[in-house]
């Protein structure tokens, strides 16, 4: 999969073909887009390349999803502000593949509509350069009086999303792919979070709701991997809520779960990547040598 989920300027559109062509020829499975112009351009020049719609396109309902399907999209990542009911409606109405965020950072502003980073830092979140301005401390005044000072609470910083308890609901809403936010995260974080969610998806598929239970050790592991001041279930069950915002000082020191980190490094990060292969060689005097190697999948 390739991410092209950024706004593409007019003068850049013509470079999109040469940018995608080598990846397309190498077997690219799908491309993720935000820009409507990029969507139509890719459908024209790479008609058999599946196109996924990024959350940055702010798909907030079934009507926009219908239009995107008519333009050739096969999968949509809805806006992160949608409820489970609204996500289910998109799937039921369009039959599109639906992919939703299940873990990681949440934006204070609407997905794909935020200008905060551009205005304050000169870096556009819609061009892949978000400075995460909402993570900074801010003063807040009401009727001329401070209700928050910079050194007190992070009033615009949202807690990270965590949906382990909602996996059955999410899968039953027609979601086919779980999206884990990993911007500027380490391989250790990626390995830890993905392996935990894989565990609970498999548990639900095997045992159903009756056998579904989340271990506290896994909740603790997710917080140990990254903690911005707690976790929430985002907008899946609540339209909005005070408990989604950090609203507290960052702790000066966090205990490190070194045992967990060592396990992840040993199991996923610092391992040699190998797969079994079979092969044959043909060598004859006066002729070019020939060697053929393949893996179990026939590659």
Question: Model-derived features: where do they sit?
Answer:
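Surface-exposed amphipathic alpha-helical tracts and adjacent flexible/coil segments at the periphery
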Residues: 1-2, 14-24, 33, 37, ...
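Short intrinsically disordered, low-complexity coil segments enriched in acidic
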Residues: 1-5, 9
């Amino acid at each position: 999969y390739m991410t092209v989920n950024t706004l593409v300027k007019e003068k850049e559109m013509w470079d999109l073909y040469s940018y995608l062509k080598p990846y397309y020829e190498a077997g690219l499975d799908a491309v993720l887009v935000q820009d409507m112009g990029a969507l139509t351009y890719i459908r024209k020049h790479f008609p058999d390349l599946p196109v996924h719609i990024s959350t940055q396109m702010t798909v907030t309902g079934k009507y926009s999803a219908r239009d995107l399907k008519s333009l050739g999209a096969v999968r949509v990542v809805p806006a992160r502000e949608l409820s489970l009911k609204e996500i289910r409606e998109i799937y039921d109405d369009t039959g599109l593949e639906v992919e939703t965020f299940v873990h990681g950072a949440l934006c204070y502003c609407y997905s794909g509509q935020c200008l905060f980073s551009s205005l304050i830092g000169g870096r556009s979140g819609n061009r892949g350069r978000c400075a995460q301005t909402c993570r900074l401390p801010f003063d807040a005044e009401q009727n001329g009086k401070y209700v928050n000072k910079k050194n007190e609470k992070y009033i615009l910083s949202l807690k990270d999303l965590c949906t382990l308890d909602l996996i059955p609901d999410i899968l039953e809403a027609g979601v086919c792919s779980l999206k884990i936010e990993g911007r500027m995260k380490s391989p250790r974080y990626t390995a830890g979070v993905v392996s935990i969610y894989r565990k609970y998806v498999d548990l639900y598929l095997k045992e159903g709701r009756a056998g579904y239970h989340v271990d506290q050790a896994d909740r603790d592991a997710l917080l140990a991997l990254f903690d911005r001041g707690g976790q929430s279930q985002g907008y899946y069950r609540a339209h909005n809520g005070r408990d989604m915002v950090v609203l507290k000082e960052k702790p000066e020191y966090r205990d490190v779960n070194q045992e967990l980190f060592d396990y992840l490094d040993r199991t996923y990060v610092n391992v040699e990547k190998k797969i079994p292969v079979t092969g044959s060689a043909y060598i004859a005097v006066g002729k070019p040598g020939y060697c053929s190697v393949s893996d179990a999948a026939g590659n």
